[in-house]
Amino acid sequence: MAYEIILGREEAEREKFGTLGSVLIGKHYVQMGQTTALAQNIYLDLNRAHVVFVCGKRGSGKSYCMGVIAEGIATLPEEQRSRLAVVLLDTMGIFWTMKYPNHKDEHLLQQWNMEGKGIPVKIFTPTGFFKKYKQEGIPTDVPFSIRPYELTPEDWNLTFDLNPNEPLAIFIARIVLTLQKQRDDYDVEDIVEAIQADAREEEHLKNAALNRFRSVEAWGVFSREATPLKDLIKGGQVSILDLSPYAVMPGGWKIKHLVIGLVAERLFIERMIVRKNEEFKSIHSAIHYLITEEEEEEERLRGKEMPIVWLMIDEAHEFLPAQGKTAATDALITLLREGRQPGIAMVMATQQPGKIHTDAMTQSDVVLAHRLTAKVDTDAMGSIIQSYLRGTLDKELTLLPRVAGSCIAVDDVNERMYPMQIRPRFSWHGGGAPKIVEEKKKALEF
C-alpha cells in the first residue's frame, strides 16, 4: 500500500487514524530521471483546526484550491461532516457555481476515478440585493444582514476612512456611544435621527455625517433582525457569503471589510463559549466513568449547534494588508493567533503574498504555494519556508510542471515539503477567465 501523505497531521495520529477525518486534495509529484509523474495521494487533515495559506499569481489555481477543500468537507461521511461547517467569503461571486456538476472536465475527472457532481451549498446574499437576485434568476438562498448595534465607533471610522482624531470621527463616535448607552438596539435610521437631533455640533459636520450614513442605507446589509449565526454555521453545511454586489460599488472593499470583520468576531466569541462547554464535558467524562445515553445525545446535539468552523477568505491581502489596517484586521489576526484553541480553522488565498500581513504567513501550518513570478512575492514566501528549501523558492517553483494547480505544499506540522498537483474539482468552477474563442461541441454521428 502506498504511503499516504496527510498535510497537518502528526505521525502518531496518521498511524492511529489513517486518512479518517481528512480530505483528498491532490497527488505528489515525483521525479524519475527526466520524467515528472504523479504518485501517492495527498490529503489535508481536518481533525484539528489549521491555518492554510494559498498563494500564487493570477490564474494559478488559488480559488480552485479553496473549492477543492470545501468540496472535500461537504462530501465527508455524515458522522464527520456534521461536526464541521464551512463559511466561504466570496468577494467576486464565483463560488455559487458549486451547486452544479463539473461536466467540462469529465475526461480529467475520469483519470482521477471521479465524476462530476454538484454540492448543496447555501448562498447568503445581503438583504438589500436578495429580492433583486431572485427576480433576475441569480442563484441565492437566504438573505444576510448584520445589526448596526454591533459596530464600534472604530468600525465606522475605518469604513468611512476617517482619522479617529479628526472632528467628524469624534462626532460619529459620540453619537454611536450615546446610542449604545441609551438603547439595547438601533438601526441606521436611528443614527441618522440622532445626528439630526444633536444640538452641540456644527452644521457642516452634521451634514458630513448624514451624507455618510445615508449612503450606508444603500448598502443593503444592515437590519435590526440580523442573520443568526446558527443559520450561517451549521454542521455539514457549506455557507457562501456572497459579497460580490459590492464589487462595483464606491468604497465596496470597505463594506466587505466591515462585514467580514464582524462575522469573524462573532465566530470567535461563539466558539469560545462552546469550547468551554466542550472542555467541561471532557473533564466531566474523565472524572465520571459512567455517562448516561441522555448526556451523550445532549453532547452530540450541542456539537451540531456550533461545529468546528472552516473560514475561507479569497483575496486575503485586501483584509489583512501588510501596511495599515481595515475593519477586518483585528478580528482576523485574533483568529490567526488564537483561533486554533476554540476550533476555528482558516483558509486564506492571495495573489500578492508580499502585500499581506506577516501573521497570515507565519501563523500558517500548511502552505500551498502556486507559481509566483513577482520578486516581492517570492521573497515574502521564501522568507517563511526557506528552511524547507534545497535552493531558492524561484528554483523550486520553476521545477513544477507548467499546469494550473501545480504547487509546493509545505507541512509545518511535520516540517516537510512536497511538490504536488491539486485534484480536479467535481463541482463547477466559476473563477475561470472569459475567452473569445470557444470550443465547439461535435455533433453526434449515427
Predicted feature locations:
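Basic- and hydrophobic-enriched, low-structure N-terminal and domain-boundary segments
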Residues: 1-59, 64-83, 104, 116, ...
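Conserved ATP-driven motor cores of ASCE-family P-loop NTPases powering translocation/secretion/packaging/pilus
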Residues: 7, 71, 335-418
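P-loop NTPase motor domains
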Residues: 48-49, 68-334, 399-413
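Conserved beta-strand position immediately N-terminal to the Walker
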Residues: 52, 239, 347
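Alpha-helix N-cap/helix-initiation motif
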Residues: 55, 59-62, 66, 249-257, ...
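Flexible loop/turn segments at secondary-structure boundaries
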Residues: 61-62, 94-96, 130-131, 248-250, ...
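Conserved P-loop NTPase motor module
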Residues: 402-446
